[in-house]
Amino acid sequence: MFELFLFIDPLCKACRNSENTVLRISEDIDSKFKLQFIPIYNLKVVQTDYCNSNNQLKKRLSSEQLADLYKNVVLDYKAALFQGMKKGRKFLTEMQDRLLTDAMSYSDEMAISIAKDCGLDVDMFVEDRRSNLAKNAIKKDQELVQNMKIEKPASAVIFNCENSKDGILTENIEYSTLFNACCDKNLTTEYLQDALSEDNLNETKMKHFRIIK
């Protein structure tokens, strides 16, 4: 079984594309595959276009408006996740598409409309979306960001749950790279450690991977 954590800027088109990439992999791979989208929620991500995606929201909105938008979107996403991973991911991607592609303005009505479209229990969603439970879930996500040494959005950490407790981090979110990594049962942290050794580094194709303890 593989587990993949994709760390994202929730209001970034490049990260939205990365989500599509890993969703394709989860559908195509034969192994059991657990996938989580983890929003990075801090001041740097709110204010910086890390992925150079020509982020119009960050150009158009004031710092205060951006901070409010990020807070609302991340809280809504965590509330949706309480009703299941798949529904939560569907909620997030629909919210991103409306904000980033359709250039719609965020509102409570939009969030509730998306919740209905995604088959969520709307009353439960409304109750959870500004709850302490959702806020604590965000805090746990940010602890995960720190523990896994994530430096920027559009980073993924892969765990081969059968072979190692350590994870493999990459900032190269491409289909072939991630698909091959998840299919290669020999891609253990021990193998990667040897491939990234000083003697082998110039020849290895694994330069974009790092080991996360």
Mark where each language-model region is.
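Structural alpha/beta surface segment adjacent to cysteine/selenocysteine redox centers
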Residues: S18-A103
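Active-site-proximal cofactor/substrate-binding loop regions of enzyme domains
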Residues: M1
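Short, thiol/selenol-centered motifs that function as redox-active sites or metal-ligating centers
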Residues: D9-E19
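Short beta->alpha junction loops/turns
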Residues: L11, L81-G84, R130
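C-terminal cap of thioredoxin/glutaredoxin-like
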Residues: F5-I8, T21-S26, D102, Y106-K213
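Flexible, glycine-rich phosphate/dinucleotide-binding loops
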Residues: K13, K44, K165
